[in-house]
């Protein structure tokens, strides 16, 4: 018998080869599922192989009943939990790895496919067959902690930010809803606005801060001319002229804990620059079943959950020991901090 996965988008082709090479007259089992349903990246599509066997092996499978079953029972499930070919699982197959490695890195939500390819190439031969979370995490952090000489950049930013207030703009829906209030605060206080992992069209001056390679790549095309960008060193690719790069590990490893959350990294950077008061806008937090981001935001988080609110609130509480934090828009993090 034969059971196939769709890692390399070859299951239908391999099934045809299997049928041709089997011994004539010998019974065999060819495993398939409706619409290729199966844990990502999915399996051989039953409707495809049935149709192929009807045409080439004189079978009489009723495809219409299969299509009806897919329409009624399978497609609603696929809308909630998708499957099928993806670049991440192609990379797992390419490097002959357990597919959980790709899933683990994908859930980080910070890596481009190019980044994932580089990390997966580093997995030792003896660790390939069985997934090892500790190995994956070590390689992920090693890759993210690429070093740059950021002393001059920190001095430049400290000169600009020192003694001033900053406003951190996160992509929650409340940012748009409360923008008049936020803009009024920025103008009144002479604060420097800094967006976190996105560009906000209404923002005037200030900076865009990116610690997520995927977000940076996705927003490259919408970058405004002469916009000021701060990147952490884990963000690969071509930097724009004048972009400022800060060592990732300088921000990810706080005094008490590790965090890859962009808003937290940005606040830690502002602390290093001598900023004593920061206002937060668009820090909505996560709520199950709700639209948690601005319309058109590219960065919806894979695997986000309400438990993240508590963790981020703990990080914010740590940061509040060093600087004053003011929420300009409603936030579930603020509720958790009370």
Please report, for each region that a protein language model flagged, where it lies by residue.
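Catalytic cores and adjacent flexible loops of soluble metabolic enzymes
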Residues: 1-151
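Metal-ion/cofactor- or nucleotide/acyl-coenzyme-handling active-site neighborhoods
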Residues: 148-338
């Amino acid at each position: 018998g034969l059971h196939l996965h769709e890692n390399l988008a070859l299951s239908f082709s391999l099934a045809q080869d299997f049928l041709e090479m089997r011994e004539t007259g010998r019974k065999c089992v060819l495993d398939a599922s409706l619409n290729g349903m199966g844990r990502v990246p999915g399996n051989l599509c039953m409707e495809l192989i049935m149709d192929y066997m009807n045409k080439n092996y004189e079978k009489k499978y009723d495809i219409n009943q299969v299509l009806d079953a897919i329409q009624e029972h399978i497609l609603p499930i696929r809308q909630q939990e998708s499957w099928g070919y993806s670049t991440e699982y192609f990379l797992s197959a390419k490097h002959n790895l357990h597919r959980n490695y790709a899933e683990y890195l994908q859930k980080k939500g910070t890596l481009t496919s190019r980044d994932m390819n580089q990390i997966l190439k580093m997995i030792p031969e003896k660790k390939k067959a069985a997934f090892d979370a500790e190995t994956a995490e070590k390689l992920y952090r090693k890759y993210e902690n690429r070093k740059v000489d950021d002393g001059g950049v920190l001095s430049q930013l400290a000169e600009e930010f020192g003694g001033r207030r900053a406003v951190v703009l996160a992509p929650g829906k409340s940012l748009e809803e409360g923008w008049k209030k936020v803009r009024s605060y920025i103008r009144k206080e002479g604060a420097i606005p800094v967006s976190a992992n996105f560009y906000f069209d209404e923002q005037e001056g200030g900076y865009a801060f990116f610690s997520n390679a995927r977000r940076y790549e996705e927003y490259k095309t919408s970058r405004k001319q002469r916009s000021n960008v701060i990147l952490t060193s884990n963000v690969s690719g071509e930097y724009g002229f004048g972009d400022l790069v800060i060592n990732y590990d300088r921000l990810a490893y706080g005094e008490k804990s590790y965090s890859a959350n962009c808003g937290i990294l940005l606040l830690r950077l502002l602390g290093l620059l001598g900023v004593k008061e920061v206002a937060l806008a668009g820090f909505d937090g996560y709520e199950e079943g709700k639209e948690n981001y601005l319309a058109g935001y590219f960065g919806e988080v894979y695997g986000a959950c309400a438990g993240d609110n508590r963790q981020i609130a703990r990080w914010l509480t740590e940061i509040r020991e060093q600087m004053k934090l003011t929420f300009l828009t409603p936030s579930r993090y603020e509720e958790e901090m009370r």
